[in-house]
C-alpha cells in the first residue's frame, strides 16, 4: 500500500476501497456534503478483492440468480421473502445510481455498467425440482415476473453455450434467466 496522508479526525472511516465503501461514501456525501470520509485499503489498488470481476459474479446481488436466498425448508417449501427483500434493495441501488447519472455526478455509466442476463443452472432431478419450485415461489412478486424457467436443452444451449458444451441431452437439468 502506498503512503498517504491520513486525517486526524474524520467523521467516517470506511474499511476497504471496493464498491460497498464507494457506494456508502457517495450516499453519505449526498446526504451530508461537508462530511469528512477516510477510506482504508490494505491492497495497492481499489476494488481488487470482493469487488473485482474475477472474485464476484458482478450481479449486484439482485437475488435473480443467487440460490442461497431461497433455501428449501424441511417440508419442501421455498420462501421467497429474503430474495424479494434483496431484489428490492438492488432496485433501490439502481435508482440511486440513476440519480447520480441525472445529476452528472457519474459520467459515462455505459463504460462500467453492463446489463447481462442473470442465470441459474442446476442438474439432477432433485435440483431441477428445487429450481422449478423456486421459480414458482418467486413468480408471486412483480420483480420476478420477467424471469424465465426452462428444462429445454436447446434453449439452455442458447442462453449459456459454454455451460452446456459437452452435456448430454439425457441429463436432467434446468435453468432460470432474468434479463436486466
Each predicted region: which residue ranges?
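A short, basic/flexible loop-to-alpha-helix module at the beginning of a structural domain
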Residues: 1-10
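Short alpha-helical segments and helix-capping/turn motifs at coil-helix boundaries
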Residues: 23-25, 42-45, 104-107
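Short, solvent-exposed beta-strand edge segments and adjacent coil->beta transition regions
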Residues: 9, 116-118, 175
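Dinucleotide-binding Rossmann-like beta1-alpha1 core, especially the glycine-rich loop
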Residues: 57-169
Amino acid at each position: 500500500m502506498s503512503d498517504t496522508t491520513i486525517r486526524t479526525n474524520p467523521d467516517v472511516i470506511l474499511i476497504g476501497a471496493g464498491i460497498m465503501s464507494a457506494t456508502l461514501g457517495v450516499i453519505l456525501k449526498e446526504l451530508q456534503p461537508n462530511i469528512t470520509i477516510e477510506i482504508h485499503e490494505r491492497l495497492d489498488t481499489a476494488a481488487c478483492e470482493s469487488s473485482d470481476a474475477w472474485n464476484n459474479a458482478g450481479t449486484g446481488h439482485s437475488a435473480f440468480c443467487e440460490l442461497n436466498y431461497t433455501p428449501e425448508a424441511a417440508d419442501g417449501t421455498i420462501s421467497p421473502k429474503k430474495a424479494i427483500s434483496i431484489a428490492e434493495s438492488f432496485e433501490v441501488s439502481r435508482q440511486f445510481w440513476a440519480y447520480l447519472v441525472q445529476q452528472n455526478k457519474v459520467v459515462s455509466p455505459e463504460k462500467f455498467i453492463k446489463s447481462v442476463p442473470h442465470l441459474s443452472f442446476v442438474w439432477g432431478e432433485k435440483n431441477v425440482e428445487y429450481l422449478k419450485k423456486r421459480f414458482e415461489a418467486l413468480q408471486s412478486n412483480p420483480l420476478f415476473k420477467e424471469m424465465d424457467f426452462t428444462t429445454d436443452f436447446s434453449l439452455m444451449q442458447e442462453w449459456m453455450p459454454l455451460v452446456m458444451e459437452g452435456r448430454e441431452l439425457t441429463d436432467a437439468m434446468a435453468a432460470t434467466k432474468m434479463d436486466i
